């Protein structure tokens, strides 16, 4: 299990990462990583970065077969 400090350190080294990448790198369940990231966001230590749907060909995620899978959510330190 990873601590919040390890999550912070990995984000500092990598710049920005997805929660799934953090979970795999730290061998920690993703719900725990999600909770730590949300807590870090509430403390003002991390920020959520969402990609724009500019790469979407149709512009409509509802009709996209992948749903909103094309909209990635990244995390970075403030």
UniProtKB/Swiss-Prot annotation:
Listed HAMAP family: FeoC (MF_01586)
Record's keyword terms, sorted: DNA-binding, Iron, Iron-sulfur, Metal-binding, Repressor, Transcription, Transcription regulation
Gene name per UniProt: feoC
Coiled-coil zones: none
Superkingdom, taxonomy of origin: Bacteria
A Pfam family it matches: FeoC
Protein name: Probable [Fe-S]-dependent transcriptional repressor
Organism this protein belongs to: Enterobacter sp. (strain 638)
InterPro entries: FeoC (IPR023732), Tscrpt_reg_HTH_FeoC (IPR015102), WH-like_DNA-bd_sf (IPR036388), WH_DNA-bd_sf (IPR036390)
UniProt: iron-sulfur cluster binding residues: 56, 61, 64, 70
KW Lipoprotein (keyword) present: no
């Amino acid at each position: 299990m990873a601590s919040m400090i390890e999550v912070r350190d990995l984000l500092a080294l990598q710049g920005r990462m997805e929660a799934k990448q953090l979970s795999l790198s730290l061998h920690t369940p993703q719900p725990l990583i999600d909770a730590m990231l949300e807590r870090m966001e509430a403390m003002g230590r991390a920020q959520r970065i969402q990609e724009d749907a500019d790469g979407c060909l149709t512009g409509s995620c509802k009709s996209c077969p992948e749903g909103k899978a094309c909209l990635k959510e990244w995390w970075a330190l403030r």
